[in-house]
Amino acid sequence: MRISKQRKKTTLAQQGRYLLICLLSMMLLFLAGSMIILNRTQRQVYERLEEISKLYTDELDNRFFRISRNLFSTVMDSSNPDSDFWKYMDLMEKDQYEEYVVTQLRKKYVSAAWDFGTDYNVFLYTQKDDSLYQLSISSDGFYAIDPYLQEALKRRINSLSQQTYAVKKKWTVMQQGDEVYMLKVAQNQGVGLGCYVNLKTILEPFSKLSLGKSGYVSLVDQNGKNIVTVTEKGIVRDSSQLDTGNYTFRQTLSQSPFEIQIKISWTGI
């Protein structure tokens, strides 16, 4: 009788162990399945964001190229008697027509805001009197330019005056205060037609993506120097506390000396 009770206790204990093993096995299978689904979801998110970033960088390169081609074709057309731009430049040689010429050119470049966006600023530079005029209208509806930026642009233009202009040549970089700009200028016969854009505006669209709590998008130069960083909260002035070397994927800009590095963090998504 005692042996029968002991066997019964042993059988119940074994059944309990078997049940526990089955439950643990089922839990492990569930966790494994969840991990597979999670990994698949992560891959799909990575692939989708990488696809979006590729489309955006392609659009940036295309925009930079179209602007470069526009500047080049306009400035290098000085021998064409039908060139409106050079007719205006001839008038500008007469000081009393300066205001008229600038007004007419601004009317001509109103479309630049639609073609390239208000962040891309087209300007005219005349070497004769070292003057720089904003031609494209800004997002606030004005043609004003910061005087410190204006002087910085003049210095950079003069430093580029001896270099041969090429449509496919990468845009140059200049810094003014805490801001970094990309610049392209075509020069001919003492006249320069150019465009500049603040680098942080290039990255702002990425702040709309689900990058995660510690995710970021950085613009990095050819030497690996971090130029501008964006998180879901916006532009980051001090990126020293971010692990900016541990990115998920990157996209190279062919028209400028930069690459865009993107990190996706699953924490907080």
Where are these regions (language model features)?
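Extreme N-terminal signal-anchor transmembrane helix of membrane signaling/transducer proteins, especially
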Residues: 3, 7-47
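Extracytoplasmic/periplasmic sensory segments of membrane signal-transduction proteins
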Residues: 14, 47-152
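Amphipathic coiled-coil signal-relay and dimerization helices
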Residues: 84, 130-138, 181-183, 224-231
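Solvent-exposed, extracytoplasmic
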Residues: 104-118, 188-228
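Conserved beta-strands of PAS-like sensory domains
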Residues: 135, 143-154, 175-210, 262-265
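Soluble sensory domains of the PAS superfamily and closely related sensory modules
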Residues: 148-169, 240-245
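Short acidic-hydrophobic surface loop/beta-edge motif
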Residues: 170-177, 184-188, 245-255
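Extracellular/periplasmic juxtamembrane segments that couple receptor/chemosensory ectodomains to their
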Residues: 191, 211-216, 220-269
